[in-house]
């Protein structure tokens, strides 16, 4: 089979104005960025507030292997398949970070015959949103240090300057650095570091803005940025972006980034790509604003949440839907035979290395043995009152007995049904079975009532424990002395009613990436607690948090080049 880049190069692309018409977006709200990309003027939401909302479909997954299970590819393929059966559909996705693109994970734009095009434009810069986030973030960091340097009128504790610089690249050498060296004219020395750009709280803020129109969204962006905690004073009180007088400039830098980006799939289905927070360290969902636009335009909006249902989907319900006044009509859980076999605990999948030979051999018993993970993830979504469909992303080595094993696991666990998906190799045609099942499930009239996991007024520690018990399968939580003190301080400071955004590994339902399947009875440890006051959530941290990825021995960047005609080669 051809590479994704080769397939993308041969695709027939429609001008972005045609895609806007196909979406149902009046062209006066389209701001073209070249021939095949555009941004959407948010006055559309002001002028079309009375348009009925379409159906809303969440795409999630089982706990993934390091290779991923094709969730984005499935979401794109489902939207294309719905169009094939006569439903006007759109897919909403997060924007790719350049770090993983040139690292090892890939671009997050699908693959094969189920991808976003033009591929290179979609994963390399797009319309400049990540640059805007980076610039605004680093401006805030500079203003924070500048306030400390010029007499420190805010009494900033230099050991508690929280904001670090960001850059959109995987570079472990930047995790810990010394700045301010070379004498007083260059500042004061202190230890800090860099995070990858999409780990910036500004990216989380961009995804959480829910204003019902252009002016409302801009006001909300400005207010959220102003609440960002950039440092602490010597007395322990927070210093905000407003305090360092940087919120206005940051908002100016991000004002265009507030507008969702319009692109297309390889079958010319509209795609909205906007915001890109990671799911293991932030909320891991595309923007509320993009979904609000999509729901006012299309009959079906397909949106993807990062990693497994225990992470991205839980945050989708408790954070994104709560903030945006949204609720899905159905959810799709993507599974693969190879991942379920891996959850049996018998196989080790390592990114960048060949799959174990035994993993590719027929063995339905191992599928059943690893099926507990699928069962748990189905339960994780059905407890929100949302019907679940399982999409089996198939590979050539999958056998009929293994596929039947997945179907039995899915239906016994409470899924409405399972559909085989082959969108990577066959495009929308390979997702028609899934599209028909999703359309049938969403036929019930009227919106579904939100069913959150916890009320906001519940104490912070109890909210954390509810997630650990009901989503992860833990027997309880253990707060370190530091975490307990931080929770008390946050509650006393008036942040006790904020929702929870857990920070944990995506490779296990637990805090331990080595625990496969559906572990139970463990104690979930909370090492420390942070706050994203601008994004509007509390961040309990389990285990080690890496906010600046590193490169492997053979990063994807080694394969990327350009030919004499200007064509990119080796990207995917």
UniProtKB/Swiss-Prot annotation:
Q: Which residues are recorded as binding ATP?
A: 65-72
Q: Which UniProt keywords apply?
A: ATP-binding, Ligase, Nucleotide-binding, One-carbon metabolism
**Superkingdom, natural source:** Bacteria
Database matches in HAMAP family: FTHFS (MF_01543)
Concerning its family, UniProt says: Belongs to the formate--tetrahydrofolate ligase family.
Instruction: Give the catalytic activity.
Output: (6S)-5,6,7,8-tetrahydrofolate + formate + ATP = (6R)-10-formyltetrahydrofolate + ADP + phosphate
Q: Which Pfam families match?
A: FTHFS (PF01268)
Membrane-crossing residue ranges in chain numbering? none
Q: What is its EC number?
A: 6.3.4.3
* Gene Ontology annotations of biological process type: tetrahydrofolate interconversion
Q: In which pathway does it act?
A: One-carbon metabolism; tetrahydrofolate interconversion
What is the recorded name of this protein?
Answer: Formate--tetrahydrofolate ligase
Q: Which InterPro entries match?
A: Formate_THF_ligase, Formate_THF_ligase_CS, P-loop_NTPase
Q: What class of enzyme is it?
A: ligase
State the SUPFAM superfamilies in the record.
Answer: P-loop containing nucleoside triphosphate hydrolases
- Gene for this protein? fhs
- What lineage does UniProt assign to this protein's organism? Bacteria, Bacillati, Chloroflexota, Chloroflexia, Chloroflexales
């Amino acid at each position: 089979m051809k590479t994704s880049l080769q397939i993308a190069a041969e695709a027939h692309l429609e001008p972005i104005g045609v895609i806007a018409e196909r979406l149902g977006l009046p062209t006066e709200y389209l701001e073209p960025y070249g021939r095949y990309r555009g941004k959407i003027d948010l006055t559309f939401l002001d002028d079309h507030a009375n348009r009925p909302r379409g159906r809303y479909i969440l795409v999630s997954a089982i706990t993934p292997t390091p290779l991923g299970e094709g969730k984005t590819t499935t979401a794109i393929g489902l939207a294309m398949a719905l169009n094939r059966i006569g439903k006007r559909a759109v897919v909403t996705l997060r924007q790719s970070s350049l770090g993983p693109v040139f690292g090892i994970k890939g671009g997050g734009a699908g693959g094969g015959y189920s991808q976003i095009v033009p591929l290179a434009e979609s994963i390399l810069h797009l319309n400049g949103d990540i640059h805007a986030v980076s610039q605004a973030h680093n401006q805030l960091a500079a203003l924070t240090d500048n306030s400390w340097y010029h007499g420190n009128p805010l009494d900033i504790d230099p050991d508690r300057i929280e904001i670090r610089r960001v850059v959109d690249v995987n570079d472990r050498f930047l995790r810990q650095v010394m700045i301010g060296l070379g004498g007083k004219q260059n500042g004061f020395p202190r230890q800090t570091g860099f995070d990858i750009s999409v780990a910036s709280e500004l990216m989380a803020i961009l995804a959480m803005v829910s204003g019902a129109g252009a002016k409302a969204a801009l006001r909300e962006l400005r207010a959220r940025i102003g609440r960002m905690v950039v440092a602490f004073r010597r007395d322990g009180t927070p210093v905000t972006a407003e305090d360092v007088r940087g919120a206005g400039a940051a908002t100016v830098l991000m004002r265009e980034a507030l507008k969702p980006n319009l692109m297309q799939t390889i079958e010319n289905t509209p795609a909205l790509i906007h915001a890109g927070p990671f799911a293991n360290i932030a909320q891991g969902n595309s923007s509320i604003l993009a979904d609000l636009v999509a729901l006012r335009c299309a009959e079906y909006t397909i949106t993807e949440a990062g990693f497994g249902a225990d992470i991205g989907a839980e945050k989708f319900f408790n954070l994104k839907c709560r903030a945006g006044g949204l609720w899905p009509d159905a959810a799709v859980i993507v599974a693969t035979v190879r991942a379920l076999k891996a959850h049996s605990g018998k196989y080790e999948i390592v990114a960048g290395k060949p799959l174990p030979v035994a993993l590719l051999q027929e063995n339905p018993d191992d599928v059943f043995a690893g099926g507990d993970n699928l069962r748990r993830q189905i339960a994780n979504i059905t407890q929100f009152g949302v019907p679940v469909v399982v999409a089996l992303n198939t590979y050539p080595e999958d056998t009929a007995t293994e596929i039947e094993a997945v179907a039995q696991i899915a239906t016994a666990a409470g899924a409405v049904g399972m559909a085989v998906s082959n969108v990577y190799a066959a495009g929308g045609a390979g997702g028609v079975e899934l599209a028909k099942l999703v359309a049938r499930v969403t036929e019930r009239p009227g919106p579904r009532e939100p069913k959150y996991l916890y009320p906001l007024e519940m104490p912070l520690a109890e909210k954390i424990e509810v997630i650990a018990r009901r989503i992860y399968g833990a027997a309880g939580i253990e707060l370190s002395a530091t975490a307990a003190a931080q929770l008390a301080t946050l509650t006393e400071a008036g942040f006790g009613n904020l929702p929870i955004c857990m920070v944990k590994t995506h490779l296990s339902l637990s805090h331990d990436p080595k625990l496969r399947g559906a572990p139970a009875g463990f104690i979930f440890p909370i090492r420390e607690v942070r706050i994203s006051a601008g994004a509007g959530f509390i961040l309990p941290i389990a285990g080690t948090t890496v906010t600046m990825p590193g490169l492997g021995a053979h990063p994807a960047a080694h394969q990327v080049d350009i030919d004499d005609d200007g064509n990119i080669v080796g990207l995917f």
